Amino acid sequence: MSRLVDDFFAFLHVERGMSAHTLDAYRRDIGALIAWGVQQAVGEVVALDRAQLQAFVAAEHRRGLSAKSLQRRLSACRGFYAWLVKRGHIAINPAAGLRAPKALRKLPRILDADEAVSFVQIPTDTPLGLRDRALLELFYSSGLRLSELCGLRWGGVDLDAGLVSVLGKGSRQRVVPVGSYALSALREWCASSGGGAQQPVFPGRYGGPISARAVQVRIKQLAQRQGMAKHVHPHMLRHSFASHLLESSGDLRGVQELLGHADITTTQIYTHLDFQYLSKVYDAAHPRARRKAR
């Protein structure tokens, strides 16, 4: 059994290009299923039927696992059984069609346009300031994922065309435009840092790509230094990019392409943010909004 599980994770890593973070989550999910099977003495997980999987989901739910975590756990199980079917180890996928309780989707927190512009406009009178300005401007200008920004090398930056080429989820390559302010900041940082094609745009302490944790800590420090009340984190800049772009353009499909979302339903969360903003405008401005009739 352990060999099959190892082979499955090798498939996810090599053929599906799954990140180490996602692989760890999947290992926990499949591990939970195996542990439940042992505890219930129901045999090997390859032999579980649909009713037993439903019992597993119910047990996890009773244990207090959130709806979102349950959905991911079921997704891992579906993928595992689908792989077993494809390899001929079992005849049918017992997890196909199984559903977890629906998760309440939280709306992402964003900076408004004025907050975002104020935040990224930090002084550039030191090399560190040049780097930080370029990093923040690029985040907000192009809506990159944290992993994409950390892995970016100068060879993937076309300062003349105003484009960056990044490796997204599932090892999918995409090209995204860079705004004029971010381009200006990148040019200054390139001139200061050297900018060799194979060099990371944002190097870490030892010359390799900067770590995700280092970026998170730095953004938190910069936000605190500016006295911002909100807890600012890298993904908030990506959320802000998407929301502001959708608000001004209304082009959901275009925003999907720029963000690198494989499924447009992932992008649709930003339409709810836009509606939330419009609702606030209505409540504040309309003479009949939320007022008791006299």
Swiss-Prot record:
Does the entry feature the keyword Cell cycle, yes or no? Answer: yes
This chain is encoded by the gene named xerC
Molecular function terms from GO: DNA binding; tyrosine-based site-specific recombinase activity
Give the source's domain of life in one word: Bacteria
What cellular component GO annotations does this protein have? Answer: cytoplasm
| Protein name, per record | Tyrosine recombinase XerC
Q: Where is the Core-binding (CB) domain?
A: 1-85
Q: Does the keyword S-adenosyl-L-methionine apply?
A: no
Task: Please give the PROSITE patterns that the UniProt record associates with this protein.
Answer: CB, TYR_RECOMBINASE
> What GO biological process term is on the record, naming one?
chromosome segregation
Task: Tell me where it resides.
Answer: Cytoplasm
Quaternary structure note = Forms a cyclic heterotetrameric complex composed of two molecules of XerC and two molecules of XerD.
Predominant location category: cytoplasm
The organism that produces this protein has a lineage beginning with: Bacteria, Pseudomonadati, Pseudomonadota, Gammaproteobacteria, Lysobacterales
Tell me more from the record: During infection by the bacteriophage Xf-phi-f1, it may be required by the bacteriophage, which may use host proteins XerC and XerD to integrate the bacterial genome.
Q: Which spans are transmembrane here?
A: none
- Similarity section: Belongs to the 'phage' integrase family. XerC subfamily.
